[in-house]
A protein has these predicted regions:
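N-terminal start-of-chain detector that recognizes signal peptides
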Residues: 11-16, 53-55, 110-111, 131-134
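A conserved segment at the C-terminal end of the G1
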Residues: 38-42, 50-67
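Positively charged, low-complexity intrinsically disordered leader regions
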Residues: 1-38
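ATP-dependent carboxylate-amine ligase catalytic core
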Residues: 20, 27-35, 61-150
């Protein structure tokens, strides 16, 4: 792989049918670990970033380990995924990309459907948070609505 940015930019960014098939597929591959996690899901038109940051700060001050998933990023993709204010490293992203890449290809072959960039980075973030045993995951809604992959 050339670099993280090129890999992320290779993902499908168009519209898909509104369903959660991709997320369910990947969560099943990982034994539905998401069912064991505590989520705070931030949605709405304005203020998601501020609200996410405030809640994260409160929980960290109380001694909790907090995973935070936001979008968009300003400079690097790493900004979207953090634990207790520390962004995921390039090495950690590459390790997860290498692990997930065969599953992405398997999904595309079997389901005859692309995985979107936002689905992929959400899956990557959830696995990262799970493996790092966070107490809470704060997720900013992506597109919003019933079929949002967050």
């Amino acid at each position: 792989m050339k670099n993280i940015e090129e890999y992320f930019n290779s993902f499908y960014r168009g519209a898909k049918s509104p369903e959660l098939k991709t997320m369910r597929y990947f969560m099943k591959k990982y034994n539905n670990f998401d069912k064991t996690m505590k989520f705070i899901h931030i949605a709405g038109t304005n203020g998601k970033g501020s609200c996410t940051e405030i809640i994260s700060n409160i929980l960290i001050k109380q001694g909790y380990k907090v995973g935070k998933f936001i979008s968009p990023h300003l400079i690097k993709y790493n900004e979207r995924i953090s634990i207790n204010k520390r962004n995921i490293s390039d090495e950690e992203i590459l390790e997860l990309i290498n692990e997930l890449q065969p599953l992405v290809e398997e999904y595309k072959k079997g389901e005859k459907e692309n995985v979107t960039f936002f689905e992929f980075i959400t899956i990557l973030a959830l696995i990262y948070f799970y493996r790092n045993k966070v107490d809470f995951v704060i997720l900013e809604t992506g597109l919003g609505g019933l079929y949002d992959c967050t």
